[in-house]
Amino acid sequence: PLFRSEIPDEAVKLPIKIKRLKVKKFCLAFFLSVTSVTSWAGDQVWCAYDPAGTQGDITRRLNDIRLYAQQYQVKFKVVSYQKEQQAIQAFDEGKCSGLAASNFNTYQYNHFMGSTSGIGLIPNNRTARNLLQLLNHPTIEKRLINKDYEAVGMIPVGTANMVMKTKKISKVAQLRGQRIGVLANNPPQQALVRSVGAQPVYVDLSNAIAQFQQNKIDIMPAPVYGLLPYNLQKDFGPDTQVINFPLAYFGVNIIIKPQAYPANFGRKIRAWFVQNSQLLTNRAIQWENHLPAYYWVDVSFYEKQSYDIMVAKIRNQYVRSGYYDAYFVELMKRLRCIDDPRYFECPMSR
């Protein structure tokens, strides 16, 4: 393991001599507290965004967590929504104490894990795996907990790449004038699109593919997972291609309301993500490998580096403004340099 988790000392010192009556009262209070925790945890609900519904991979992973949680006397059920906003609304309205939703739309609950969706921050599944392995490190753990919400993990989905219906674009300069789908609540995406002379068009996760099919946008950033139900040539056009260059990383963040759960429950769930980090990212890699090779288009190292520099410039503006978590950005730089020392922000590349 990269780090060893630190467990706070919560031992309570009791007097050596204690009356038998006090012991009985203590035991009774302890018993009542345990039984009350068990019963109240049994009513918990996790609202989950899964485009594939109850049979989707995201729901399956959440049910794995549900079974894992039972060994800690915590029971919850998973309610899946195919429209993300419905899951978020149910969570905000108090209908559920857990939420599984995209890292793009969980920013409001946790700044650190919300930054996992940042442009140019997580370049591949290996870096995502390394992040998961660090979730219970004390320096990171304290950034995952605030008064009302706690981030307990992320299900990796994969990198978001540009999907387009033409084979005429292979350079950044050729993006000028193109209509590119962006999320309305994501200013860095909008700034990035404008920086290349393209036109940002607002979409959300539920209508982006429909907008692309109806030619309301020319370029759709998307993870391969979202494309798997489609035949790209038949459903989008004969010249459809996917640029093998990640714009951002797509993951499903798990957010809970910690007051609804026993102490240290969040840490136990993060431990599950640490233990299963390789399995989770392998699944994301399998999805990406499932897309036939002839759809992928590589760009030159020079083009990648030019684009990386442009992305970093915009990203750093949003670090200074406080939109992205500064510690998270520095952590991602270090993890990225371990994986790709040639990246221009790494010491070895200078």
Which residues does each predicted region cover?
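Short, small-residue-biased leader/transition segments that mark boundaries at the very start
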Residues: P1-L2
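Sec-dependent signal peptide recognition
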Residues: K24-A29
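Bilobed "Venus flytrap"/periplasmic-binding protein-like clamshell domains
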Residues: G42-Y72, E150-Q214
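Alpha-to-beta junction loops
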Residues: F91-A101, R179, Q199, Q214-P223
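Contiguous mixed-secondary-structure segments that line small-molecule binding/active-site clefts
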Residues: S102-S195, P246-S349
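Glycine- and acidic-residue-rich phosphate-binding/metal-coordinating active-site segment common to enzymes
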Residues: Q199, V203-P238, I243-N244, Y249-F250
